[in-house]
């Protein structure tokens, strides 16, 4: 092994998902740009590192209107059409954004019907084409507008399925109903 190289020098780059290889061969790496603040919401936009040469060079694409929408999970709905699902620092809902051009531009995130208490989520495309999201289906009680609400109980755990790229979620199953974990980040 040689000396490690800095892949992304921008301070505050934070990720939770692996690099994904799209049908086009493009690499996309979802992250968010964390900065210190008293409210926990000083920017914190979602961004994507994109490479068209297998990681030799990268460029950054920021998602508009994404402050406080973090830990994007990118799902390739069809070649060139992507959806990103994010947890909410406001502890209200899971948010969704879409790209119709292989990640070059993104829509502003909009809330889904799935609640979120600012705990991590995981979204994947199944072989059937459905989208599955694992999450904690709770809100944080009485969050303050403009201030990050930190997760409380991380239970129950549920999995929701969508047949339309994450626009609707008609199938939800609670997988773990136990007392869960009360944590701070």
Predicted regions and their residues:
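Asp-box/BNR beta-propeller blade signature and adjacent active/binding-site loops
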Residues: 1-185
């Amino acid at each position: 092994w040689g000396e490690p190289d800095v892949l992304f020098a921008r301070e505050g780059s934070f990720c939770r998902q692996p690099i994904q290889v799209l049908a086009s061969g493009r690499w996309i790496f979802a992250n968010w740009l964390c900065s210190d603040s008293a409210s926990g919401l000083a920017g914190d936009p979602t961004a994507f590192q994109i490479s068209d040469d297998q990681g030799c060079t990268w460029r950054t694409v920021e998602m508009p209107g994404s402050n406080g929408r973090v830990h994007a999970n990118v799902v390739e709905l069809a070649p060139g059409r992507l959806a990103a699902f994010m947890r909410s620092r406001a502890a209200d809902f899971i948010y969704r954004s879409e790209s119709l051009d292989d990640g070059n531009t993104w829509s502003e995130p909009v809330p889904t019907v799935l609640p979120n208490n600012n705990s991590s989520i995981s979204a994947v495309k199944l072989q059937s084409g459905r989208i599955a999201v694992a999450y904690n289906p709770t809100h944080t009680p009485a969050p303050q507008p403009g201030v990050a609400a930190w997760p409380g109980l991380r239970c129950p755990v549920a999995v929701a399925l969508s047949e339309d790229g994450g626009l609707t979620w008609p199938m939800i199953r609670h997988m773990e109903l136990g007392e869960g974990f009360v944590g701070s980040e």
